[in-house]
Regions:
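Membrane-interface interhelical linkers
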Residues: 1-17, 45-75, 88, 121-127, ...
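Glycine-/small-residue-enriched transmembrane alpha-helix faces in small-molecule transporters
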Residues: 1-39, 44, 78, 86, ...
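Hydrophobic alpha-helical transmembrane segments of multi-pass membrane transport proteins
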Residues: 17-21, 25, 51, 74-93, ...
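Small-residue-rich packing faces within the transmembrane alpha-helices of Major Facilitator Superfamily
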Residues: 20, 45-46, 134, 190-194, ...
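Helix-loop interface residues and adjacent transmembrane-helix termini in multi-pass membrane transporters
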Residues: 30, 93, 119-121, 178, ...
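Juxtamembrane helix-start motifs in multi-pass secondary transporters
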Residues: 36, 181-185, 245
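Hydrophobic transmembrane alpha-helices of multi-pass small-molecule transport proteins
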Residues: 48, 74, 122-144, 162, ...
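C-terminal transmembrane-helix exit sites in multi-pass transporters
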Residues: 51-52, 106-128, 254-274
Length: 292
């Protein structure tokens, strides 16, 4: 661990590879989106449980969580469940590049929500970044419109996935002031897993009807995308600025799209690439503004 503390860039690279695997693994799943997402969250909760209950500090904190924090964590888990379902479903209808790029606009939606509901400030430069990101999304939609209605539907699902994860992030800003990251994420992931299991039940989908491949994909998503992805980036905040960590996450669409090009033959067109550059550039610019 001391070696990694001296060379934290290694963890940045691991984090990028971890989150970039998510879209690819989802594509390999033959199960419905709700089932794949449910397995990911069930494995995540299972892997996190020994950490939470194995440490007295976290165990005591979990048992002393007040009603407001618990309720907000459940609501946050509902929106996170919607995010996973919508994004996984999006990947069944549009390209990996389009889906991952559009989901990256979550930062923009967080800023809008912060301004609208939490009385945050939104500068003129931030508004310009949002406008450019919107233009990029329109360009991707135009590029995908030539591929058929299913691709546009996938783009819309990715946009809704970005908005729902933004709500999850906004609730986190409120709750995190009174609870540790470990306990908060455990509460949210547990609620998220429960919601996804209910979705499977309502849709009449069995968790065990799609073979061991789906179970394994869920485990790999939990390990790579959650633990070696998002959790690693949280660790990196100790050594890098928030803007650098945010900018590093923007490598996800690039790496995912590159893997999709080799694995699925998905080669982005010129308009799609241009829209992607506008979105990623505007999100990077906004992340720099946030850091200042």
């Amino acid at each position: 661990m001391k070696y990694l503390e001296k060379h934290p860039m290694i963890m940045i690279v691991i984090g990028i590879l971890g989150i970039s695997m998510s879209a690819i693994l989802v594509r390999f799943s033959s199960a419905p989106s709700a089932v794949t997402a449910a397995w990911r969250l069930c494995w995540t909760v299972l892997l996190q449980t020994p950490v939470v209950f194995g440490k007295v500090q976290f165990r005591r904190e979990l048992m002393s969580v007040n009603r407001k924090t618990a309720l907000l964590s459940v609501v946050s888990g509902v929106f996170l469940a919607l995010h996973f379902f919508l994004w996984f479903e999006s990947l069944q209808h549009t390209t990996v590049a389009s889906s991952t790029i559009i989901v990256c606009t979550e930062v923009i939606w967080v800023s809008l929500g912060f301004w609208l509901f939490l009385k945050g400030k939104l500068s003129g430069k931030a508004v310009a970044a949002i406008a450019v990101a919107f233009l990029g999304s329109v360009m991707i939609a135009l590029a995908d419109s030539g591929m058929g209605g299913s691709h546009l539907y996938g783009d819309l699902l990715a946009l809704l996935a970005a908005i729902t994860v933004a709500v999850y992030m906004l609730i986190g800003r409120i709750v995190r002031s009174g609870v540790s990251t470990t306990v908060y994420t455990y509460l949210v992931y547990t609620a998220c897993a429960a919601v996804l299991l209910v979705m499977c039940l309502v849709q009449g989908q069995s968790m065990v009807a799609y073979g061991m491949q789906t179970v394994l994909i869920g485990l790999l998503l939990a390990l790579f995308s959650t633990i070696l992805g998002h959790s690693v980036f949280s660790w990196c905040l100790k050594y890098f600025s928030p803007s650098f960590v945010s900018a590093s996450k923007l490598c996800e669409p690039v790496v995912s799209a590159t893997m999709a090009a080799f694995l699925f033959g998905e080669i982005p067109g010129a308009l799609q690439l241009a829209g992607g550059v506008l979105i990623l550039g505007s999100v990077f610019y906004y992340a720099r503004l946030e850091d200042k």
